[in-house]
């Protein structure tokens, strides 16, 4: 009959400090069908990050060579570092029927939507500017200049929220995760997603 359905694309965007990474990890744990899109980046690894698992860490020169060769489905410069999503690896996963989860910024989301022409795009929002600033300070990893830059970038990113398919305010982690989970399940039930399953059912009638 063929596989149950085709792979889907789920894209999460959020200002830094909104809780996107926590939500992403929970989704990957609950749904083994997900494959996480491992981005390439020129930034330095943070404590605990593993090359090839969290990111592919490369030099600026190597990144630019890959970009110019058409290697990326999307790429962007964020906070002075480059990030990019490998195109072929993404298409291979989707062809295998895997669902692919992206954790990218709004620039990348625009490019990815144009490149792949598919998927559910979800924007994770902080409850307020004050709460976002509190979370950034509580992390204890950024200096004042970096915090100010992240807040300024957050304001720009929030203006892009209307371009997304769904918005989730993360003022309560459990509720935010329930909403994200529902958005994913809704996408898996869409006619576009289940076209492979329908093709398999109809094949026997066409013989």
UniProtKB/Swiss-Prot annotation:
ATP binds at residues 14-21. PROSITE patterns: GUANYLATE_KINASE_1, GUANYLATE_KINASE_2. GO terms for cellular component: cytosol. It catalyses: GMP + ATP = GDP + ADP. Pfam families: Guanylate_kin (PF00625). The keyword Cytoplasm applies. InterPro entries: GK/Ca_channel_bsu, Guanylate_kin-like_dom, Guanylate_kinase, Guanylate_kinase_CS, P-loop_NTPase. SMART domains: GuKc. It is found in: Cytoplasm. Residues 7-185 form the Guanylate kinase-like domain. Its EC number is 2.7.4.8. Its main location: cytoplasm. GO terms for molecular function: ATP binding; guanylate kinase activity. Keywords: ATP-binding, Cytoplasm, Kinase, Nucleotide-binding, Transferase. PANTHER family: GUANYLATE KINASE, GUANYLATE KINASE-RELATED. Belongs to the guanylate kinase family. Essential for recycling GMP and indirectly, cGMP. This is Guanylate kinase. It comes from Nitratidesulfovibrio vulgaris (strain ATCC 29579 / DSM 644 / CCUG 34227 / NCIMB 8303 / VKM B-1760 / Hildenborough) (Desulfovibrio vulgaris).
């Amino acid at each position: 009959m063929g596989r149950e359905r085709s792979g889907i694309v789920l894209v999460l965007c959020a200002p830094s400090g909104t809780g996107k990474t926590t939500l992403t990890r929970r989704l990957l744990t609950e749904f083994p069908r997900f494959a996480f899109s491992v981005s390439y980046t020129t930034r330095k690894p943070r404590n605990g990050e593993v090359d090839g698992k969290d990111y592919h860490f490369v030099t600026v020169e190597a990144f630019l060579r890959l970009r110019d060769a058409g290697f990326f489905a999307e790429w962007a410069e964020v906070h002075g570092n480059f990030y990019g999503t490998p195109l072929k690896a993404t298409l291979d996963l989707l062809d295998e029927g895997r669902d692919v989860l992206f954790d990218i910024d709004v620039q990348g989301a625009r490019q990815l939507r144009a490149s792949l022409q598919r998927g559910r795009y979800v924007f994770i929002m902080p409850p307020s500017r004050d709460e976002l600033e509190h979370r950034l300070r509580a992390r204890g990893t950024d200096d004042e200049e970096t915090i100010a830059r992240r807040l300024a970038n957050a304001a720009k990113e929030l203006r892009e929220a209307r371009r997304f398919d769904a918005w989730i305010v993360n003022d309560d982690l459990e509720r935010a995760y329930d909403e994200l989970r529902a958005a994913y399940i809704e996408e898996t039930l869409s006619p576009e997603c289940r076209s492979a399953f329908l093709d398999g059912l109809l094949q026997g009638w066409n013989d």
